[in-house]
Regions:
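Structural signature of outer-membrane beta-barrel channels/translocons
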Residues: 21, 56-58, 102-108, 121, ...
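Positively charged n-region of N-terminal signal peptides that target proteins for export
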Residues: 1-4, 19
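Sec-dependent N-terminal signal peptides
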Residues: 3-14
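Membrane-embedded beta-strand positions of outer-membrane beta-barrel proteins
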Residues: 28-32, 53, 65-69, 99, ...
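Predominantly the C-terminal beta-signal and adjacent terminal strand-loop region
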Residues: 72-79, 141-186
Length: 186
């Protein structure tokens, strides 16, 4: 009898959806990526490419849960922000996975937002400054933080700044990104 009850509970839970999720959509972002060290004498930054996809689970008009997967690729050109030569650098070549929550002002046409979460970065990270030296490959954790604006009648265009703090390699990877949200059928 217990086995039948366990099987019925498992089957019922497979068909029951989360009741607090009102809408689902997919957000795709592309942008210019930048990596900077936490501490630097020469004020260096490496430029590159950023790409990310998020599953948007809207709980209320002002709160969303967003699991994400993305990619960040930045390369140093050996120069500082004033275009002078520098021995310091910070580079990221990583696949990003994690989850974050977004709090937004539910305003039509223009809705400001902020989000925070936790995630993992899988790849190669190099930070070379006069204060620290890290050359790591593998899996490290990151803390994502973003803010920006959702634009349009249905707030389906996203313009924002997104940051990934990597404390274990003392660097910050960020991006100026533009995104498009595509509704999914329930």
């Amino acid at each position: 009898m217990k086995k039948i009850l366990v099987v019925l509970v498992v089957l019922a839970s497979q068909f029951a959806g989360a009741q607090f999720i009102k809408e689902k959509s997919l957000n795709l972002q592309i942008g210019y990526g930048v990596t900077v060290p936490y501490y630097s004498v020469d004020e260096v930054a490496s430029g590159g490419f950023f790409l990310q996809g998020e599953l948007v689970l809207k709980a209320t008009s002002w709160f969303e849960i967003r699991p994400y997967a993305g990619f960040m690729l930045t390369n140093s050109n050996g120069k500082n922000l004033q275009d002078g030569p520098s021995d310091e650098m910070a580079e990221t070549k990583a696949f990003l996975l994690g989850g974050k929550v977004r709090v937004r002002a539910p305003i039509p046409w223009i809705a400001p937002y902020a989000e925070i979460g936790i995630g993992t970065s899988i790849g190669k990270f190099e930070t070379k400054t006069y204060f620290s030296y890290y050359d790591k490959s593998g899996v490290i954790y990151h803390i994502p933080f973003s803010f920006g604006l959702e634009l349009g009648r249905n707030n389906n265009v996203d313009i924002g700044l997104t940051y990934y703090f990597h404390p274990s390699v003392e660097q910050l990877a960020g991006a100026f990104a533009v995104g498009l949200t595509i509704p999914l059928k329930n």
